[in-house]
């Protein structure tokens, strides 16, 4: 039996390319500082082609932020459920997050812009659909900590 090439979904590949190229734009300039025209130019698409993939800038922005966050979430979640005491896991989590922020400048800037965003609808979508699992995992770890015990 001959080998068969696995066909990829061209729309999915293009969406991934758009995320990869638009996230640094949002990281540098924030939501308000990036236009769909800027993204289309960076990606090498027409605006019409960009709108084929995303209904509006909100959808693109939220999808790009989600993609960037999820790309890093697995490593952080592994730390939270790894071996060790709750204090040790919390320390490794904070260290890992700090290292991530120190070495991935675009991700750091994107997180800063997300935190500064005053649009309640976007904040709500991100909190409920992107950050919720991580918030719950950190909360669960915190609930394991003995408040009467010093970490050291």
How should each PLM-predicted stretch be described?
Residues 44, 60, 68-72, 103, ...:
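Amphipathic, well-ordered alpha-helical segments in soluble domains
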Residues 70-78, 92, 120-146:
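Amphipathic alpha-helical packing segments from all-alpha helical-bundle domains
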Residues 6, 17, 21, 25-59, ...:
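Helix-turn-helix
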Residues 63, 77-103, 137, 146-151:
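Hydrophobic alpha-helical connector segments
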Residues 15-16, 36, 58, 62, ...:
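Short, structured helix-loop boundary elements
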């Amino acid at each position: 039996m001959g080998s068969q090439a696995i066909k990829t979904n061209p729309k999915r590949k293009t969406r991934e390319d758009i995320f990869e190229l638009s996230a640094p734009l949002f990281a540098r300039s924030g939501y308000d500082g990036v236009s769909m025209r800027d993204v289309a130019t960076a990606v090498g698409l027409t605006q019409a082609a960009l709108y084929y993939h995303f209904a509006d800038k909100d959808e693109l922005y939220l999808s790009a932020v989600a993609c960037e966050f999820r790309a890093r979430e697995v490593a952080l979640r592994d730390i939270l459920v790894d071996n060790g005491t709750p204090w040790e896991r919390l320390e490794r989590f904070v260290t890992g997050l700090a290292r991530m922020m120190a070495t991935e400048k675009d991700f750091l800037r994107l997180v800063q812009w997300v935190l500064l965003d005053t649009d309640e609808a976007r904040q709500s979508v991100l909190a409920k659909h992107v950050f919720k699992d991580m918030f719950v995992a950190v909360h669960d770890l915190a609930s394991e900590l003995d408040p009467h015990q010093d970490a050291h």
